[in-house]
Amino acid sequence: SLVKAREIPAGECLVFEGFMDFLSAVTLGVTGNADCLVLNSVANVEKAAGLLDGYGRIGCFLDRDEAGRRTLAALTMRYGERVTDRSSLYDGCKDLNEYLQLTTKKQKNNHLKIEEQ
């Protein structure tokens, strides 16, 4: 699924493995003015790849597992330096949704500690 940020084409497209990761990115505010492509499954990378042809920059927020690494490699092989791995944002987590959940949990715990004082 391609989610356009505006009527006019954006210079960057962000790629997500699943819809929950896309919604997590929106919640975290990392989508900016970029268009977003949700693969729904890494098996769809070849079908979806043609949608990325017109973008100068492709940011990948893929799962930090073997399937995510293969998908990143396939996109890098096709688009070269236009592709950027953005998964360092959620280093230590499987995916962006897990990162959001942990971040939210930490914020709640910190808020509770402040209220207790």
Regions found by a protein language model. Give the residues of each.
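Glycine-/acidic-rich phosphate or pyrophosphate-binding loops and their flanking alpha/beta elements
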Residues: S1-G11
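TOPRIM fold recognition
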Residues: G11, T27-Q117
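Glycine-rich, flexible N-terminal cofactor/catalytic loop recognition
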Residues: L14
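Helix N-cap/beta->alpha junction signal
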Residues: E17-M20, R64
